């Protein structure tokens, strides 16, 4: 397994392909609870623009992309409806004695691991590289997890994220989770 930054157009296309398979609408209802799902659909041009600013962390096995963690800086939040809703909401949440919006933070735009490699610790490995690549520039990572996506919430909590708020927007209920990189443990 190789974990690195996404750098080619082919890798961006592979991210988009893996995303498509794992979107909520493409996962049978009976599998969503155990398998998890993705909520936001990103088009190729948006993924390219996001990757130009803050490259995604990707995992490849035998040359095939099997997982990714999208990094999204604040300038991209207004470019997508769900990210815009997230940004508008999270900036007002108290955290560490200030509002989240008062910090330099990085949004996890999406985390996805291919079904065939789940259960091998890849989400943790992706996030370890994510932190190593971005913690010098940001106080923490923040994202939201659909309240119906218990598989994703469990994964995020195991990595070190903590729930800081529960919000409703975009027609769903969300856990807002923060991984505070100012703490010394890695």
Task: Specify the residue positions occupied by each region the protein language model found.
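A short helix-loop-beta-strand connector motif used in the catalytic cores of GNAT acetyltransferases and
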Residues: 44-58, 75-81, 107
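Conserved GNAT acetyl-CoA-binding A-motif
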Residues: 106, 134-146
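Conserved catalytic-core motifs of GNAT/GCN5-like acyltransferases
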Residues: 144, 157-176
């Amino acid at each position: 397994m190789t974990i690195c930054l996404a750098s080619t157009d082919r890798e961006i296309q592979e991210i988009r392909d893996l995303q498509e398979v794992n979107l909520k609408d493409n996962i049978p209802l009976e599998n969503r609870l155990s398998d998890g799902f993705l909520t936001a659909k990103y088009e190729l041009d948006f993924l390219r623009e996001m990757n130009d600013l803050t490259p995604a962390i990707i995992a490849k096995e035998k040359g095939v992309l099997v997982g990714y963690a999208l990094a999204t800086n604040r300038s991209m939040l207004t470019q997508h409806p769900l990210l815009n809703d997230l940004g508008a909401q999270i900036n007002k949440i108290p955290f560490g004695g200030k509002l989240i919006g008062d910090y330099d933070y990085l949004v996890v735009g999406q985390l996805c691991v291919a079904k065939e490699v789940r259960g091998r610790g890849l989400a943790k490995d992706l996030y370890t590289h994510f932190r190593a690549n971005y913690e010098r520039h940001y106080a923490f990572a923040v994202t939201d997890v659909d309240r119906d996506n218990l598989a994703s919430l469990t994964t995020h909590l195991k990595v070190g994220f903590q729930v800081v708020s529960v919000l409703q927007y975009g027609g769903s209920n969300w856990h807002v989770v923060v991984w505070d990189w100012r703490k010394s443990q890695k």
